[in-house]
């Protein structure tokens, strides 16, 4: 006898959809969002925290997509690499880190150069300037005299023109410590692409590896000149400041701790079978990354991954249930790698579908992005009736919010709201349950206190709405179910497990946000199990 179609639990992550009461420069409040407005007023909802200590970051530190999806999938507050590495800098254990000490010794023995590559920013999302300064202190202790710094400017997780202040602070630290020189400057648009736009990576790669003379300007002077031409930090073209190309026998430390935007440049610098663009592989090359960017990379790792056991995807798979993940290119690693606690490979019964993001320079040129195709894919998966858990990410609020273009962000929000309506129809047809939330804020705050475009994330809370269909038009429980206040992203996985009627493992320290005294569970839910 054929199994009955499954009534899925669907987690919809509206990336960058924060909550802020003021409507000024608030793309979410200014957009026409009839679907979300109806859900917010008609169904159980609450606000949850996505920043600072609530997600394993320092107090007051804005959340981000990597951190958000880690916490969402893990069902616990995950101590973040930012804190882990900052502690190592502060307590001086960085100076004894085996991978870092060894590469310094190799460079010293070969009398070659040590290159430090990474985002020069105090944004705390991909890196932190204090970590770079800690590496300079390490180089001094290891008596290195050829330390080349390849600055990547931010302008995305910080104000658009904050780079000059970060570089000035770096130049001051170089002078104080007595080690290092800035040899290149590049905006993250080029050096940290993650969407396989290899022409961008190649521009940074060529500047890093080719012998080109500087023109006598300092790094701050170069940045000022770009500002004069209305080119902000993110888009600074790769520029040689001083001699110091990466050559055979050198050592490289990539000090970004977040993997997704560091991988492509590392592939180009280290992988023998790299095919993104034509280049001659530099060998030998000692290479250390702060964290594990990709297990396939032929590099040493300074801070090995933390093992996360009994995360949501693992629990669902162990119960023999099927699950589905989909997102477009920009957020695909987040619903797979990060949601699975840093594991590349899917769990048994976990299917995935990647949707290509539009090939545009910046997403304000295409604010709809690929949301419609993501929705088509998700609806098809839901209506197959075989998946107990479906995880979907809509990238628009975050990726368009990062451009600082308010009108485009409003269009992005309206696109996602329309897609939600279609998605809810499919979920209703299957009698499923949907949880709608976000990983962090962004699009609700589009200008800073001075009225300038704000392109970074926020520390604002995000919505959580739960809607359970019972064979009607998504009526749900209405007022019969409450959602607890003061929740965190870590509480989402336990909430999903409670709806699926699966036990919460002890490693999950989050709590279900469904108030127990009001909990109503459909007793006829029929999960589809994988045959063994």
Swiss-Prot record:
Its cofactor is Mn(2+). Mn(2+) 1 binds at residues 398, 402, 457. Catalyzes the interconversion of 2-phosphoglycerate and 3-phosphoglycerate. It catalyses: (2R)-2-phosphoglycerate = (2R)-3-phosphoglycerate. It is an enzyme of class 5 (isomerase). One of its GO terms (molecular function) is manganese ion binding. Gene3D superfamilies: Alkaline Phosphatase, subunit A (3.40.720.10), BPG-independent phosphoglycerate mutase, domain B (3.40.1450.10). Its EC number is 5.4.2.12. This is 2,3-bisphosphoglycerate-independent phosphoglycerate mutase. InterPro entries: Alkaline_phosphatase_core_sf, BPG-indep_PGM_N, Metalloenzyme, PGAM_B_sf, Pgm_bpd_ind. Pathway: Carbohydrate degradation; glycolysis; pyruvate from D-glyceraldehyde 3-phosphate: step 3/5. Substrate binds at residues 126, 156-157, 188, 194, 258-261, 331. Disulfide bonds: none annotated. One of its GO terms (cellular component) is cytosol. Keywords: Glycolysis, Isomerase, Manganese, Metal-binding. PANTHER family: 2,3-BISPHOSPHOGLYCERATE-INDEPENDENT PHOSPHOGLYCERATE MUTASE. Pfam families: iPGM_N, Metalloenzyme. Binds 2 manganese ions per subunit. GO terms for biological process: glucose catabolic process; glycolytic process. Belongs to the BPG-independent phosphoglycerate mutase family. Mn(2+) 2 binds at residues 15, 65, 439-440. Monomer. The active site is at 65 (phosphoserine intermediate).
